[in-house]
Amino acid sequence: MLDSYKASRIAPWLHPLWESLDFAKFPNAILLHGQSGIGKFAFSVELAKALLCEGSESAAKPCNQCEACHWFDTGNHPDFISLVPETHRKLLPHADYESDDAPKRGKAARDDDGEPSEKKEKKIISIEETRQAIENLSIGSHRGGNRVILIYPLEMLRSDAANTLLKSLEEPPANTIFILLADRVDRVLPTIRSRCRLLTAPRPDRAQGLTWLKRQLSNISGLKMSEVDVETIYDEQGGAPFSVLDSLVARHNKDDKDELTISIQASRYLLQSMAQGGRINWLDTAEKTHKAQYAFLLASMQRWISDLQSVVQGGEPRYYPKHVTTLQGLSRMANVQKLLQFWKSLVQARRHENHPLANRIQLEALLSQYQQIFGS
């Protein structure tokens, strides 16, 4: 049973995974993988803190009392290295990243020129950042204990950066633990996977995820939403409670420039357009949605097509049950072979969703292909 502190920091559906960990015989590298937005990152940050904790052997880790725990909470632990793209740095223990050179112990890496790179580039971990982080490992532990390097999302590593990481995994520095996270483990190099202990983060069932989400929302002052609206958004976003929470908080704070908020708004417009079937204005839809995260739009399209395929086969929609009437109407007009081919196109597109050239042109091509599903 987890203590109340860890229970509040770790999502309940991840409690069994935490309790299965053997801190006395912890591997030098783990690869935690699972759906985006289900709490993997929060789990891993807490794990890093536990591995760096200097409390007594008999005490639960992290103890939250020792100097190492306090340093970690302020974002200044010298033996913690985080390697995450700019889009994820707000999820780390707080620290003044604005004045840092990239990368430093306890702090995330910045671009060499200190300026934000292009939108898609912000999601990529560069070879320079990776090399500097690995070089920091060779200096030695400041506290005489473990050193922990957290890398997320692992699939965002460029091939040259992944090869640099692979060399360190093949000959790991003493007392160094790699915590690697991936939303799509199939995109991680097999050679990297083979050198890690694989841990699967389970997705919560709908009731569990919604219970957790509603509890978090109840603690936000001034936020008022009906349970029906919360459940609708939860289903639309594929049952990822952490992602839904982030988007609702951003909307509550009226942060219209938040990347997740932009993507959710675009996704809703995209689905409204796709609900028109063969009457979709794919040029207009691409124009009004292409500034959102391409990966987010692709995921929404996949969920819609998955539901449409289910209805075509006589089943029920999983993600958009409120659109069952629309889906049933589309299913009667859909060319099954073209529908299957479109699904394959989406799968192929997701393999390259983070490529710098993934943009409006690709989105237009997919939406045009979608329209043809309902042609004569």
Where are the regions that the model predicts?
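Conserved amphipathic alpha-helical interaction elements at protein-protein interfaces in regulatory
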Residues: 53, 139, 170-171, 373
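Hydrophobic residues in beta-strands of the RecA-like P-loop NTPase core, especially within AAA+ ATPase
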Residues: 32, 151, 165-166, 182
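Charged, glycine-rich active-site and insertion segments that engage polyanionic ligands
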Residues: 1-50, 60, 67-68, 174-176, ...
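Clamp-loader machinery-focused feature within the broader ASCE/P-loop NTPase space
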Residues: 1-160
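Charged catalytic carboxylate motif
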Residues: 129, 160, 164, 300, ...
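A broadly conserved amphipathic alpha-helix scaffold signal in soluble, globular proteins
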Residues: 131-135, 167-170, 214
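Conserved catalytic/switch belt of AAA+ P-loop NTPases
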Residues: 138, 163-179
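Helical "lid/switch" subdomain of P-loop NTPase nucleotide-binding domains
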Residues: 129, 149, 153, 161, ...
